[in-house]
Amino acid sequence: MSKQFDVVVIGGGPGGYIAAIRAAQLGKTVACVDAATGKDGKPALGGTCTNVGCIPSKALLQSSEHFEHANLHFAEHGISAKDVKMDVSKMISRKDGVVKQNNDGILYLFKKNKVTFIHGRAAFAKTDGGGYTLAVTANDKSVQEITGTHIVVAT
């Protein structure tokens, strides 16, 4: 027997996770299915912007701007900073931490709003008068079925 939800959102990017949270706030039982996995093997909600686009690029940009200020602009303020070096591996590590903090924040919002998160790839399996059955394949290739009265495709 598959788990039944009022709404199933396929995709945990900026459109999907917000749709899932809002549906839950409106009193619906909601599941969100997303297959993205971070470097640590854990779910990486938030879509392209959060994981490989806007957020990581802005984190790296901020680090490089601090480097530029230390090298070129501190002296204007009477601050002497000699032999300033860039540690790219630390910059990357900081960027990864910022991304993880965003991923974890979305998972927290799901928990707070009672959205069931399912880590896997969803595919339509069948339909009947009461909704749609989705087959969700996890990274370990196990498959579970869930049913939703309404499906939001946000991929």
Locate the predicted segments by residue.
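Beta1/beta-strand and adjacent pyrophosphate-binding region of the FAD-binding site
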Residues: 2-15
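Glycine-rich flavin
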Residues: 2-5, 21-28, 32-155
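N-terminal glycine-/charge-rich "phosphate-binding" loop or analogous flexible N-terminal tail
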Residues: 13-19, 23
